[in-house]
């Protein structure tokens, strides 16, 4: 299936998706407990386009599907210089801080938790990252995306 993003066509088949987090919330009712799920998903084509989305539903697969649809609505283009990023950048979102540093070729992706799938799906091959402060998956993903969007060639 193809979608339009700005002036370019987006082919969903060339994108990969990674589920970063699945959360469960419980509502206690007279008959017992009712569960609902939320899913945080990152999609990317390993060529500079990457997006994230949050989906909520009564079943996990439905939440993931909604999150993927949301991720395609939030695609950003990441500026990649060779196999890494152009310069150091630090960004804060709520209580999460993320530090991204360019790395020399052959270093690989040194990232943890929620940051790793984002930089891998963006197509960055060599990068050093450090997550500081809160490790809430949504906040870390949002801080990483905001930082990658601010990188200038």
Swiss-Prot record:
Signal peptide: none
GO biological process, alphabetically ordered: translation
HAMAP family, A to Z: Ribosomal_uS5_B
Notes on the domains: The N-terminal domain interacts with the head of the 30S subunit; the C-terminal domain interacts with the body and contacts protein S4. The interaction surface between S4 and S5 is involved in control of translational fidelity.
Residues covered by the S5 DRBM domain: 15-78
UniProt name for this protein: Small ribosomal subunit protein uS5
Function per UniProt: With S4 and S12 plays an important role in translational accuracy. Located at the back of the 30S subunit body where it stabilizes the conformation of the head with respect to the body.
Family assignment from sequence similarity: Belongs to the universal ribosomal protein uS5 family.
Listed InterPro entries: Ribosomal_Su5_D2-typ_SF, Ribosomal_uS5, Ribosomal_uS5_bac-type, Ribosomal_uS5_C, Ribosomal_uS5_N, Ribosomal_uS5_N_CS, Ribsml_uS5_D2-typ_fold_subgr
A Pfam family of this chain: Ribosomal_S5_C
GO cellular component, one term: small ribosomal subunit
Alphabetized UniProt keyword annotations: Ribonucleoprotein, Ribosomal protein, RNA-binding, rRNA-binding
Gene Ontology terms, MF aspect: rRNA binding; structural constituent of ribosome
Oligomer status and interactors: Part of the 30S ribosomal subunit. Contacts proteins S4 and S8.
């Amino acid at each position: 299936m193809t979608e339009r993003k700005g002036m370019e066509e987006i082919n969903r088949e060339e994108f990969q998706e990674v589920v970063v987090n699945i959360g469960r919330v419980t509502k206690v009712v007279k008959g017992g407990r009712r569960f609902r799920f939320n899913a945080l998903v990152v999609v990317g084509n390993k060529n500079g386009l990457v997006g994230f989305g949050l989906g909520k539903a009564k079943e996990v697969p439905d939440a993931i599907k909604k999150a993927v649809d949301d991720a395609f609505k939030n695609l950003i283009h990441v500026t990649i210089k060779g196999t890494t990023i152009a310069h150091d950048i630090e960004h804060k979102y709520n209580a999460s801080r993320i530090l991204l540093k360019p790395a020399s070729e052959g270093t690989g992706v040194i990232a943890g938790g929620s940051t790793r799938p984002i930089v891998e799906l963006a197509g960055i091959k060599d990068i050093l990252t450090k997550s500081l402060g809160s490790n809430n998956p949504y906040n870390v993903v949002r801080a990483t995306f905001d930082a990658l969007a601010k990188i200038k060639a």
